[in-house]
């Protein structure tokens, strides 16, 4: 995505007013991308596309439904850990937040017909 002229001021102001937060945001994005790439090597694109042509509206909708279920699982896990003060056993709470964010980005890639390409 190219940065539009109108957004440069907001980006500059954010980085000046909140330098630690802006840098930490970029670090989290790098962690997200690294985790996405590692998992992509394990799963491949068919776990989202289910071997279907996502250019077809019904297949894309089916893919979105699958993503919704995965996101709902993560939200339920986060809710259980936070609201019930549960101890983390399998993956950290932070990993769940990153997974949830990555599923949102994957949904955007499906929408933009970029998944698996």
Regions found by a protein language model. Name each.
Residues 1-117:
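Intrinsically disordered, low-complexity regulatory regions
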